[in-house]
């Protein structure tokens, strides 16, 4: 009677080459990527500080916006610093567990942002379609439960990815053709059947995100129906203006994500470096643009930022250090 011992081999490190085919341009690509990342972190940090400090912004809509800002910082910080280390310092190696952790947070932030956008759509639906019931429907306990549901759902959907990767033996190559780790890209290096990884990696998160998109579309169809029933044009314009920034953020999040998904599946003739370059831009550009969009289109945010900077200027002028 023979016994077969199957050993699951995990490499000590994976190698991230950056953007294959564009190695000669890494240093030039790093400059706009670094500027985008700095702008994203500063913009979202300012947004969070303003929402926390300004009492008139202590409402559910801006609470969800602050959650989105935190997710944006985490998403870009999970990926961009490592990419810059590859471009600048040739730091191509990443430990196996660190690679799995990075992939987990990348996917969790993506699913989490989708859920937050759904929560913000629900907030706008209640505010416009049932304004008299807004304060009774979206109480702070309810908002807290929604926030907890967003985090719990994101964690539970992506957590199995850790075990799906750790169960695989990697005995072929340890070179991940990317600048950061993501589930399917790492799973394809395994010398075993990855059917479960492919089905789970694509179907479960995508189904949840598509469900979010459908619910957001239903919310905004009901919002538009309610808006066009308003008696005056000024009332319609005011109602729509409260949704403008949210709609911009929704488009910036979902359009690139579905474009990337479709090109991965059907764009067989698109060079690999184009896919990876778009993936790097996707985790950096929307987080940079979100606070700018809300700052430009939302009067309360603009006034809050101006108020905070005025306070800083006043403190600098009256402080002994500034005199």
From Swiss-Prot:
InterPro entries tied to this protein: GPCR_Rhodpsn, GPCR_Rhodpsn_7TM, Olfact_rcpt, OR51/52/56-like
Residues in compartment: Extracellular: 1-27, 78-101, 163-198, 261-275
GO cellular component, one term: plasma membrane
Sugar-bearing residue positions: 5
Origin: domain of life: Eukaryota
SUPFAM superfamilies (UniProt xref): Family A G protein-coupled receptor-like
Topological region Cytoplasmic: 49-56, 123-141, 220-239, 297-323
Disulphide bridges: 99-191
Pfam families: 7tm_4
Membrane topology, record value: Multi-pass membrane protein
Compartment(s) where it occurs, according to its Swiss-Prot or TrEMBL record: Cell membrane
Protein role: Odorant receptor.
UniProt-recorded name of the protein: Olfactory receptor 52B2
Organism field: Homo sapiens
């Amino acid at each position: 009677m023979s016994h077969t011992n199957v050993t699951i081999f995990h490499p000590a490190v994976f190698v991230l080459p950056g953007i294959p085919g564009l190695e000669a341009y890494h240093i030039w690509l790093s400059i706009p990527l670094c500027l985008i990342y700095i702008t994203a972190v500063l913009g979202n940090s300012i947004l969070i500080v303003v929402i926390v400090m300004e009492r008139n912004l202590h409402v559910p809509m801006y609470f969800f916006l602050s959650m989105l800002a935190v997710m944006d910082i985490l998403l870009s910080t999970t990926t961009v610093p490592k990419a810059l280390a590859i471009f600048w310092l040739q730091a191509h190696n990443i430990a196996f567990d660190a690679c799995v952790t990075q992939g987990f947070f990348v996917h969790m932030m993506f699913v989490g942002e989708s859920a937050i956008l759904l929560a913000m759509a629900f907030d706008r639906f209640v505010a416009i379609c049932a304004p008299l019931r807004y304060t009774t429907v979206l109480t702070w306990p309810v908002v807290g439960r929604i926030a907890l549901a967003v985090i719990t759902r994101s964690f539970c959907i992506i957590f199995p990815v850790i075990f799906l990767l750790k169960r695989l033996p990697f005995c072929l190559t340890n070179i991940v053709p990317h600048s950061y780790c993501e589930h399917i890209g790492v799973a394809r290096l395994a010398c075993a059947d990855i059917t479960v990884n492919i089905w789970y990696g694509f179907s479960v998160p995508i189904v949840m995100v598509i469900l979010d998109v459908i619910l957001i579309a239903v919310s905004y169809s009901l919002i538009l129906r309610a808006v066009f029933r308003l008696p005056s044009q000024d009332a319609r314009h005011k109602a729509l203006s409260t949704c403008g920034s949210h709609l911009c953020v929704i488009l910036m999040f979902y359009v690139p994500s579905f474009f990337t998904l479709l090109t991965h599946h059907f764009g067989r003739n698109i060079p690999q470096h184009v896919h990876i370059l778009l993936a790097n831009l996707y985790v950096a550009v929307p987080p940079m643009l979100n606070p700018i969009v809300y700052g430009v289109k939302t009067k309360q945010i603009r006034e809050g930022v101006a108020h905070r900077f005025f306070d800083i200027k006043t403190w600098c002028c009256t402080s002994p250090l500034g005199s």
